[in-house]
Curated annotation (Swiss-Prot):
SUPFAM superfamilies xref list: LDH C-terminal domain-like, NAD(P)-binding Rossmann-fold domains
Protein name: Malate dehydrogenase
Gene responsible for this protein: mdh
Organism for this UniProt entry: Symbiobacterium thermophilum (strain DSM 24528 / JCM 14929 / IAM 14863 / T)
NCBIfam families according to UniProt: MalateDH_bact, PRK06223.1
Cross-referenced InterPro entries: L-lactate/malate_DH (IPR001557), Lactate/malate_DH_C (IPR022383), Lactate/malate_DH_N (IPR001236), Lactate_DH/Glyco_Ohase_4_C (IPR015955), Malate_DH_type3 (IPR011275), NAD(P)-bd_dom_sf (IPR036291)
């Protein structure tokens, strides 16, 4: 049986985390792609990880390269390449530089791995997913952004610590843009089947919601750069769902054509991920307050997309 193949563009912190977690699960062989100036680094990272596999018990083969021809036949291509956030920077500060990078990568993916599913992580990820979709020419089910799995994981972490329960018992839901305007939906969040509103006081939940929104910035302020392990694990959750056709209900950034009243934009919503990529958008019933919050985040994403449509996507 032919092994699955995963290509990861960008061998930085998040690319490494994604590769290591995917290799540990033996999801498929992995190609780490980076710039020519970083090719030896990517080769070294891949070799170091591969030498760990006999001890770990995985048969994953890894290679590092700067040659996009090496991604031929990839089932999933993850785009992590881009300029990382530094303290004081917003994701939006990165938009012009990273849009050029993502556009170039997506065009190469379309050339060398035309049947793959693209998962975008590069920030600001909602608008970068839109760039990848347009630059690749892929159908909307094969270009997905990662934000909600990570944001929900942070939400679950903070809630579980406050409740004093297992992380695994907390089921959460975060919609909207990947930034300060994301919308953690407390109504759809529970621990062991019990609504979290029955387990924690409102002020505690409100503080956790705010910490979740600032979760990425908290890591940046502590480490001086973006997170790597949690985003990598979130990506692997999505990769696994696609490669193994698991039909997982996961929050993902999807191209919307009328859902929630939004058109021609990419935004974090609940989705079904399986062998066909993003197979379905699940549209939740929202309260007026929740919809207003979602609209606020969507407008920020819309503004960036319109800027990109008038700029780099018009070239």
């Amino acid at each position: 049986m032919k092994r699955k193949k995963i290509a990861i563009v960008g061998s930085g912190f998040t690319g490494q985390g994604t590769a290591l977690f995917a290799a540990a699960r033996d999801l498929g062989d992995i190609v780490l792609v980076d710039l020519p100036a970083r090719e030896n680094y990517a080769k070294g990272v891949a070799l170091d990880m591969m030498e760990a596999m006999p001890v770990y018990g995985s048969d994953t083969r890894l290679v590092g390269t700067s040659d996009y021809a090496e991604i031929a036949g990839a089932d999933v291509v993850v785009i992590t390449a881009g300029v990382p956030r530094k303290p004081g920077m917003s994701r939006e500060d990165l938009v012009n530089t990273n849009a050029g990078i993502v556009k170039d990568v997506a065009e190469k993916v379309a050339r060398y791995a035309p049947d793959s599913v693209i998962i975008v992580l590069t920030n600001p990820v909602d608008s970068m997913t839109y760039v990848a979709l347009k630059a690749s020419g892929f159908p909307k089910n094969r270009v997905i952004g990662q934000s909600g799995v990570l944001d929900t994981a942070r939400f679950r972490t903070f809630l579980a610590n406050a409740i004093g329960c297992s992380f695994q018992d907390v089921v959460g839901c975060v919609l909207g843009g990947h930034g300060d305007d994301m919308v953690p939906l407390v109504r759809y969040t529970s621990a062991g089947g019990i609504p979290v509103e029955k387990l924690l006081p409102k002020e505690t939940i409100d503080a956790i919601v705010e910490r979740t929104r600032k979760g990425g910035g908290e890591i940046v302020n502590l480490m001086g750069t973006s997170a790597g392990y949690a985003p990598g694990m979130a990506l692997v959750e999505m990769i696994d769902a696609i490669l193994n056709d698991r039909k997982r209900i996961l929050p993902s950034i999807a191209y919307l054509e009328g859902e929630y009243g939004y058109t021609d934009m990419c935004l974090g919503v609940m989705t079904v991920l399986g062998g066909g990529g993003l197979e379905k958008v699940i549209e939740l019933d929202l309260t007026d307050e929740e919809k207003v919050a979602l609209d606020k985040g969507a407008q920020g994403v819309r503004n960036l997309i319109e800027m990109l449509k008038a700029g780099i996507l018009a070239q």
